[in-house]
């Protein structure tokens, strides 16, 4: 940018996103108002599938995602002396995890789900009173991603009833879908083709 500053006009902002992995950084940056006066926004990701020396601009349908923490609350009891008095939060969470991994795929596009952590229990002879599940869902569109969130919610409700426990769900982060602006794609492609050593990949990589 500095090498070409006398050829440029207007204002250019360079932003680096914190907390990308939990998809919290971009939301906070947008809420701060720092991009409110931007006419165009160019984003890049080091994990994209273009090779060195290539630029890919015709992107669409990056998977939306929602990160959720679900906590099941049961009732502790001695597993040997009085198990009937307990409500097993770990058993509820484990059952929910199995059901979540069996959610039917969506006919309109890709879906993903992963239960990455399940933390529970106080001791080997104690009915677990609390279980924390950390999971994520993904969908090709916002609607498909919401379908996955709804399915997870329905499973948690049913499991809570079946196991006599309660639960709470917290949204820890989310990312919406992406549709590139064709006018800007054309400008970037033309600039890329005019730059020695750069190959333009003019097709979706998804």
Where would I find each of the regions flagged by the language model?
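Active-site alpha-helical elements of protease catalytic centers
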Residues: 1
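Histidine/acidic-residue-rich, glycine-tolerant segments that coordinate divalent metal ions
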Residues: 6-117, 122-126
């Amino acid at each position: 940018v500095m090498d070409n500053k006398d050829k440029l006009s207007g204002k250019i902002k360079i932003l680096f996103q914190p907390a990308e992995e939990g998809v919290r950084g971009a939301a906070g940056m947008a809420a701060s108002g720092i991009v409110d006066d931007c006419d165009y926004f160019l984003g890049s990701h080091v994990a994209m599938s273009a090779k060195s020396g290539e630029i890919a601009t015709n992107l669409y349908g990056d998977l939306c995602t929602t990160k959720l923490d679900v906590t099941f609350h049961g009732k502790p009891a001695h597993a040997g002396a009085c198990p009937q008095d307990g409500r097993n939060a770990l058993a509820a969470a484990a059952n929910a995890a199995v059901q979540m991994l069996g959610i039917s795929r969506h006919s309109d596009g890709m879906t993903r789900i992963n239960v990455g952590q399940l933390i529970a229990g106080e001791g080997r002879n104690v009915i677990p009173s609390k279980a924390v599940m950390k999971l994520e869902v993904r969908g090709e569109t916002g609607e498909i991603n919401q379908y996955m969130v709804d399915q997870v919610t329905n499973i948690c409700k049913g499991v809570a009833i079946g196991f006599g426990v309660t639960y709470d769900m917290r949204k820890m982060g989310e990312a919406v879908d992406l549709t590139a602006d064709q006018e800007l794609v054309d400008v970037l492609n033309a600039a890329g083709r005019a730059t020695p050593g750069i190959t333009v990949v003019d097709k979706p990589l998804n």
